[in-house]
Amino acid sequence: MIKINLQLFAHKKGVGSSRNGRDSAAKRLGVKRADGQFVLAGNILVRQRGTKIHPGVNVGIGKDDTLFALKDGKVKFARLGRDKKQVMIVTAE
């Protein structure tokens, strides 16, 4: 007579370990100054990844694609064609 010794092992790891449970902090991206709002030179207008909104007159662009005011004035958002947006600063001069 043949005896078979069959052992079954766990397919999944047991309790006490979690493979989830991590998340990155939000990056606070988006428009920081509204259309028509007065800004000072150096104020951040838009934080973005890539150029969803392009810089216009009196607007600079940082190495992380952040748009900021180069001069004091009012913020003006405009559309360029169907799919392009631009932000500019209109000065009082």
From Swiss-Prot:
Pfam families: Ribosomal_L27. GO terms for biological process: translation. The N-terminus is cleaved by ribosomal processing cysteine protease Prp. One of its GO terms (molecular function) is structural constituent of ribosome. InterPro entries: Ribosomal_bL27, Ribosomal_bL27_CS. One of its GO terms (cellular component) is cytosolic large ribosomal subunit. It comes from the Bacteria. NCBIfam families: L27. This is Large ribosomal subunit protein bL27. It comes from Ruminiclostridium cellulolyticum (strain ATCC 35319 / DSM 5812 / JCM 6584 / H10) (Clostridium cellulolyticum).
